[in-house]
Regions:
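Conserved beta-strand scaffold positions in the cores of enzyme catalytic domains, especially
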Residues: 15, 168, 244-245
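Amphipathic alpha-helical
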Residues: 125-151
Length: 248
């Protein structure tokens, strides 16, 4: 990972390790969870000095879903509540730089946009096996990491989401996602050691990685004998008309 980070940094690019663990969850699981969307959405609305229609609509919709079984006052009441809450949270954040607050305090302040018991019930009802405390702990750990490098709240939110970074993950973790361009690292026998024992499973993994790319996929290898170790996979690429480039 450090070698990859250094290589990307030479071109002004950052990496986001979606396999990094925060307690029981990976970063990928943290970033896609609805509890994260709620907490970070509220913080964005409170802190970032520009209109964020997507964040507003997404956060408002989440609040309505959390409160719907208990509150029948409708969208206008929820919108007024969110606007007032974001204004109060902005004051709270302005009174303390990130270096003077704890991640647990920030989570508590942002998540209090809805009733704690209602929020817990909502999260537990979304997916079988979801553990509210584990998700909460993971978000706090990620916030803590993001708050270490800066006292500016805008930078904290950017660091948390790492939106400008290139995500790196295993093929299996990429299921259900789609990217413009996918780069598969090291298509050779050393990284694909399990292929020899179970070629069909290896092909399935290969196609999972291939199908994540909406427009372009690049398979790399540093081994001059990679073709001989994975002949079936390279034959598929050849049949598809894939171009080969020697970068050395």
């Amino acid at each position: 990972m450090p070698a990859l980070e250094a290589a990307f940094a030479r071109y002004g690019l950052k990496l986001r390790n979606d396999e990094e663990r925060f307690g029981k969850l990976t970063l990928q699981e943290v970033l896609k969870h609805e509890l994260t969307h709620l907490v970070i959405g509220v913080l964005q609305l409170a802190r970032i000095d520009r209109q964020l229609p997507d964040a507003w609509l997404d956060t408002l919709a989440l609040i309505r879903r959390v409160r719907e079984p208990y509150d029948f006052r409708g969208d206008r009441a929820a919108a007024n509540h969110l606007a007032a809450f974001a204004a109060d949270l902005r004051v709270w954040l302005d009174e303390r730089p990130a270096s003077a607050a704890t991640a647990a305090e920030v989570f508590a302040a942002a998540s209090s946009v809805v009733d704690a018991a209602e929020l817990r019930a909502f999260i537990l009802g979304q997916d079988i096996g979801d553990e509210f405390d584990a998700i909460k702990a993971a978000i706090i750990l990620r916030l803590e990491q993001s708050m270490q490098a800066t006292s500016n709240w805008d930078d904290v939110l950017r660091a948390f989401l790492a939106v400008d970074a290139v995500p790196i993950m295993t093929c299996h973790r990429s299921k259900g996602l789609e990217y413009h361009t996918v780069i598969a690292l090291a298509l050779d026998g050393e990284q694909w050691w399990s292929y020899k024992g179970d070629p069909e499973e290896g092909k399935s993994t290969f196609f999972v990685g291939l199908s994540r790319a909406a427009h372009r996929v690049i398979f790399t290898s540093y081994s001059p004998v990679a073709r001989h170790r994975l002949p079936d996979l390279y034959a598929l690429l050849d049949a598809a008309g894939a171009e080969q480039t020697d970068w050395v």
